[in-house]
Amino acid sequence: MKLWLFACLVACFVGAWMPVVHAQGAFEDCCLGYQHRIKWNVLRHARNYHQQEVSGSCNLRAVRFYFRQKVVCGNPEDMNVKRAMRILTARKRLVHWKSASDSQTERKKSNHMKSKVENPNSTSVRSATLGHPRMVMMPRKTNN
C-alpha cells in the first residue's frame, strides 16, 4: 500500500514539473566566460567558429572556436579573436569556392564524355598541333 502511494506521489510530482521544463526549451550551449590570453598560435588551429549573442540563457557575447576535441570561448573585442574570425571566414569561402569549381569541372568532363558516347565516330577538334593555326607538323628530314 505504501509503495502504491509513493508511486502516485512521484507521478503527480513529475506531471506537475513537466510543463515547466518543456516551456523553458532546449538546453543551450553557451559560453559563461572568456578564455583569457588566447594566443594566435592556438587560434590558428581552430576548425570553425560561432558567434554567441545575448539571448535566452546565454547572457554573454562571445565567440566559440571549435577545435578537434574542445571548444574555446573568446572575447569578440580581442584583436586575436577578430583576426582568427577573419581568417576562418576566408578559409571557409576558399573551400566553398574550390568545391564549386571542382563540381563545374566535373560537369564539363561529364558533358564531354556524354558527347563522345552519343557520337562515337566524331573526331576531336584538337589536332597534333594542339589547335594552333600557324603551326604545321612536318616530317623530319634525315641526312644520309
UniProtKB/Swiss-Prot annotation:
<dbReference type="GO" id="GO:0097534">
    <property type="term" value="P:lymphoid lineage cell migration"/>
</dbReference>
<comment type="similarity">
    <text>Belongs to the intercrine beta (chemokine CC) family.</text>
</comment>
<dbReference type="GO" id="GO:0006935">
    <property type="term" value="P:chemotaxis"/>
</dbReference>
<comment type="function">
    <text>Potentially involved in T-cell development. Recombinant protein shows chemotactic activity on thymocytes, macrophages, THP-1 cells, and dendritics cells but is inactive on peripheral blood lymphocytes and neutrophils. Binds to CCR9. Binds to atypical chemokine receptor ACKR4 and mediates the recruitment of beta-arrestin (ARRB1/2) to ACKR4.</text>
</comment>
<dbReference type="InterPro" id="IPR034133">
    <property type="entry name" value="Chemokine_CC_DCCL"/>
</dbReference>
<feature type="region of interest" description="Disordered">
    <location>
        <begin position="98"/>
        <end position="144"/>
    </location>
</feature>
<feature type="disulfide bond">
    <location>
        <begin position="30"/>
        <end position="58"/>
    </location>
</feature>
<keyword id="KW-0964">Secreted</keyword>
<dbReference type="InterPro" id="IPR036048">
    <property type="entry name" value="Interleukin_8-like_sf"/>
</dbReference>
<dbReference type="InterPro" id="IPR001811">
    <property type="entry name" value="Chemokine_IL8-like_dom"/>
</dbReference>
<feature type="compositionally biased region" description="Polar residues">
    <location>
        <begin position="118"/>
        <end position="127"/>
    </location>
</feature>
<keyword id="KW-0202">Cytokine</keyword>
<protein>
    <recommendedName>
        <fullName>C-C motif chemokine 25</fullName>
    </recommendedName>
</protein>
<keyword id="KW-0732">Signal</keyword>
<keyword id="KW-1015">Disulfide bond</keyword>
<dbReference type="GO" id="GO:0006954">
    <property type="term" value="P:inflammatory response"/>
</dbReference>
<dbReference type="GO" id="GO:0005615">
    <property type="term" value="C:extracellular space"/>
</dbReference>
<dbReference type="GO" id="GO:0006955">
    <property type="term" value="P:immune response"/>
</dbReference>
<keyword id="KW-0395">Inflammatory response</keyword>
<feature type="signal peptide">
    <location>
        <begin position="1"/>
        <end position="23"/>
    </location>
</feature>
<feature type="disulfide bond">
    <location>
        <begin position="31"/>
        <end position="73"/>
    </location>
</feature>
<dbReference type="GO" id="GO:0008009">
    <property type="term" value="F:chemokine activity"/>
</dbReference>
<dbReference type="Pfam" id="PF00048">
    <property type="entry name" value="IL8"/>
</dbReference>
<keyword id="KW-0145">Chemotaxis</keyword>
<dbReference type="GO" id="GO:0042379">
    <property type="term" value="F:chemokine receptor binding"/>
</dbReference>
<dbReference type="GO" id="GO:0050900">
    <property type="term" value="P:leukocyte migration"/>
</dbReference>
